[in-house]
């Protein structure tokens, strides 16, 4: 791997992980309240699962973004990176809406919008780099599961 390629991967992975870490840090109090007081739907995993899964997913997102960034310059590449950044912003704010504001209904609507953005991102990634697109499938599946949990929490609480 070329040094510039290595730096590109490192940047995108670290950037994406940093966004996730900042979101986690900003919601640490809300997360604690959530874990102690919220009625959770069936199939809710233990709290320790979430940071592990998100750490892996943010790394996969970063790898995918790096692959797109390293692709030849094109309109599809630019649109892919823009969608990546937009969905990352939506991802970042979902945690704040859900954990800090405890606005579970609005958080669900926000999450559905994030889900749609992830699908659009996968479609756009696929136009430039199929592997980058495939790397986003676990993210889409996890957000689908998160939507189930979010809706269940909204209904139960």
Q: What spans do the regions from the language model cover?
A:
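Interfacial loop-to-transmembrane junctions
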Residues: 123-141
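Membrane-interfacial loop-to-transmembrane alpha-helix junctions, especially the N-terminal start
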Residues: 75-84
